[in-house]
Amino acid sequence: MNAYMTLSCKVGSFNRVLDELIKLNLSKKDVFLLFGPVDILVRFSGLKDLDEFISKWFNPIRNITPDEPMIDKTQTLIVISEGRSFTEEPYAFLFLNTQPRNLELVQEALQNIPQVLSADTVFGPYDVICAVRAKDIVDLQQLVSRIQNEVPNIQGTITGIVASLY
Protein backbone atom coordinates (compact mmCIF):
# COMPACT_ATOMS: atom_id res chain seq x y z
CA MET A 1 0.00 0.00 0.00
CA ASN A 2 1.19 3.50 -0.82
CA ALA A 3 -0.08 6.87 0.36
CA TYR A 4 0.66 10.57 0.32
CA MET A 5 0.10 13.23 2.96
CA THR A 6 -0.11 16.94 2.27
CA LEU A 7 0.71 19.40 5.02
CA SER A 8 -0.24 23.06 5.21
CA CYS A 9 2.00 24.76 7.77
CA LYS A 10 1.61 27.85 9.90
CA VAL A 11 3.25 30.81 8.20
CA GLY A 12 7.03 30.65 8.56
CA SER A 13 7.16 27.19 10.14
CA PHE A 14 7.77 24.86 7.18
CA ASN A 15 11.52 24.52 7.90
CA ARG A 16 10.85 23.36 11.44
CA VAL A 17 8.16 20.94 10.22
CA LEU A 18 10.64 19.57 7.66
CA ASP A 19 13.21 19.03 10.43
CA GLU A 20 10.63 17.17 12.52
CA LEU A 21 9.65 14.97 9.56
CA ILE A 22 13.28 13.97 9.01
CA LYS A 23 13.54 13.13 12.75
CA LEU A 24 10.74 10.60 12.15
CA ASN A 25 13.16 8.75 9.84
CA LEU A 26 11.41 9.74 6.64
CA SER A 27 13.74 9.69 3.66
CA LYS A 28 14.49 13.10 2.17
CA LYS A 29 13.63 11.46 -1.17
CA ASP A 30 10.02 11.10 0.03
CA VAL A 31 9.54 14.59 1.49
CA PHE A 32 8.86 17.46 -0.91
CA LEU A 33 8.63 21.16 -0.14
CA LEU A 34 6.16 22.66 -2.60
CA PHE A 35 5.31 26.09 -3.94
CA GLY A 36 1.63 25.58 -4.56
CA PRO A 37 -1.61 24.65 -2.84
CA VAL A 38 0.14 22.91 0.08
CA ASP A 39 3.52 23.40 1.75
CA ILE A 40 4.77 19.83 2.05
CA LEU A 41 4.02 16.55 0.30
CA VAL A 42 5.15 13.28 1.90
CA ARG A 43 5.19 10.00 -0.02
CA PHE A 44 4.84 6.66 1.80
CA SER A 45 5.66 3.39 0.03
CA GLY A 46 5.48 -0.27 0.99
CA LEU A 47 2.94 0.06 3.78
CA LYS A 48 1.37 -3.19 5.00
CA ASP A 49 -2.07 -1.68 5.57
CA LEU A 50 -3.98 1.40 6.67
CA ASP A 51 -3.40 0.65 10.37
CA GLU A 52 0.37 0.76 9.83
CA PHE A 53 0.07 4.09 8.03
CA ILE A 54 -2.04 5.56 10.84
CA SER A 55 0.12 4.35 13.73
CA LYS A 56 3.56 4.77 12.15
CA TRP A 57 3.06 7.97 10.15
CA PHE A 58 -0.31 9.75 10.36
CA ASN A 59 -0.54 10.06 14.16
CA PRO A 60 3.12 11.05 14.72
CA ILE A 61 3.00 13.63 11.91
CA ARG A 62 -0.24 15.27 13.01
CA ASN A 63 1.18 15.54 16.54
CA ILE A 64 4.47 17.19 15.56
CA THR A 65 5.37 19.84 18.15
CA PRO A 66 2.22 19.57 20.30
CA ASP A 67 3.30 22.55 22.46
CA GLU A 68 3.29 24.84 19.44
CA PRO A 69 1.08 23.51 16.64
CA MET A 70 2.76 24.20 13.31
CA ILE A 71 0.57 22.16 10.96
CA ASP A 72 -2.74 23.84 10.14
CA LYS A 73 -4.14 21.17 7.83
CA THR A 74 -3.38 17.69 6.51
CA GLN A 75 -4.85 15.71 3.64
CA THR A 76 -4.28 12.02 3.06
CA LEU A 77 -4.24 10.51 -0.41
CA ILE A 78 -4.43 6.71 -0.46
CA VAL A 79 -3.06 5.19 -3.67
CA ILE A 80 -5.57 3.08 -5.60
CA SER A 81 -3.35 2.22 -8.55
CA GLU A 82 0.39 2.88 -8.59
CA GLY A 83 2.11 4.50 -11.51
CA ARG A 84 5.77 3.96 -12.28
CA SER A 85 8.11 4.30 -9.33
CA PHE A 86 10.59 7.15 -9.59
CA THR A 87 13.84 8.15 -7.92
CA GLU A 88 14.52 11.34 -9.88
CA GLU A 89 13.43 14.46 -8.00
CA PRO A 90 10.40 15.86 -9.79
CA TYR A 91 10.24 19.47 -10.92
CA ALA A 92 6.59 19.55 -9.87
CA PHE A 93 3.58 17.52 -8.79
CA LEU A 94 0.26 17.87 -10.57
CA PHE A 95 -2.93 17.17 -8.66
CA LEU A 96 -5.62 16.23 -11.17
CA ASN A 97 -9.35 15.67 -11.08
CA THR A 98 -11.39 13.53 -13.46
CA GLN A 99 -14.62 11.59 -13.37
CA PRO A 100 -14.16 8.35 -11.41
CA ARG A 101 -14.91 6.17 -14.44
CA ASN A 102 -11.95 7.74 -16.27
CA LEU A 103 -9.20 7.07 -13.71
CA GLU A 104 -7.45 4.32 -15.65
CA LEU A 105 -7.70 6.17 -18.98
CA VAL A 106 -6.18 9.32 -17.50
CA GLN A 107 -3.43 7.38 -15.72
CA GLU A 108 -2.50 5.48 -18.87
CA ALA A 109 -2.49 8.60 -21.05
CA LEU A 110 -0.32 10.47 -18.54
CA GLN A 111 2.22 7.66 -18.35
CA ASN A 112 2.65 7.79 -22.12
CA ILE A 113 4.06 11.32 -21.84
CA PRO A 114 7.87 11.13 -21.43
CA GLN A 115 8.08 13.99 -18.88
CA VAL A 116 5.64 12.24 -16.55
CA LEU A 117 7.68 10.34 -13.97
CA SER A 118 4.68 8.71 -12.31
CA ALA A 119 0.90 8.97 -12.16
CA ASP A 120 -0.88 7.39 -9.19
CA THR A 121 -4.66 7.26 -8.91
CA VAL A 122 -5.73 8.11 -5.37
CA PHE A 123 -8.61 8.36 -2.92
CA GLY A 124 -8.84 11.90 -1.58
CA PRO A 125 -9.58 15.42 -2.75
CA TYR A 126 -7.77 14.70 -6.04
CA ASP A 127 -8.07 11.73 -8.37
CA VAL A 128 -4.52 11.51 -9.72
CA ILE A 129 -1.19 12.70 -8.36
CA CYS A 130 1.42 13.06 -11.05
CA ALA A 131 5.18 13.66 -10.64
CA VAL A 132 6.71 15.45 -13.63
CA ARG A 133 10.12 16.55 -14.86
CA ALA A 134 10.77 19.91 -16.51
CA LYS A 135 13.86 22.00 -17.29
CA ASP A 136 12.34 25.27 -16.10
CA ILE A 137 9.06 27.09 -15.57
CA VAL A 138 8.50 27.57 -19.32
CA ASP A 139 9.00 23.85 -19.91
CA LEU A 140 6.56 23.12 -17.06
CA GLN A 141 4.01 25.51 -18.54
CA GLN A 142 4.26 23.74 -21.91
CA LEU A 143 3.95 20.33 -20.24
CA VAL A 144 0.85 21.32 -18.24
CA SER A 145 -0.70 22.74 -21.39
CA ARG A 146 0.12 19.53 -23.27
CA ILE A 147 -1.43 17.40 -20.53
CA GLN A 148 -4.57 19.53 -20.44
CA ASN A 149 -4.91 19.34 -24.23
CA GLU A 150 -3.86 15.72 -24.89
CA VAL A 151 -5.08 13.77 -21.88
CA PRO A 152 -8.83 13.24 -22.17
CA ASN A 153 -11.32 13.77 -19.35
CA ILE A 154 -9.24 16.01 -17.07
CA GLN A 155 -11.55 18.33 -15.15
CA GLY A 156 -8.92 20.36 -13.32
CA THR A 157 -5.22 20.60 -12.52
CA ILE A 158 -3.35 22.12 -9.61
CA THR A 159 0.43 22.43 -9.76
CA GLY A 160 2.92 22.35 -6.89
CA ILE A 161 6.51 23.18 -7.86
CA VAL A 162 9.14 21.29 -5.86
CA ALA A 163 11.59 23.49 -3.93
CA SER A 164 14.95 22.46 -2.55
CA LEU A 165 14.58 21.02 0.95
CA TYR A 166 17.55 22.84 2.49
Which residues make up each language-model segment?
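A compositional/biophysical signature of low hydrophobicity enriched in polar/charged and small residues
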Residues: 1-166
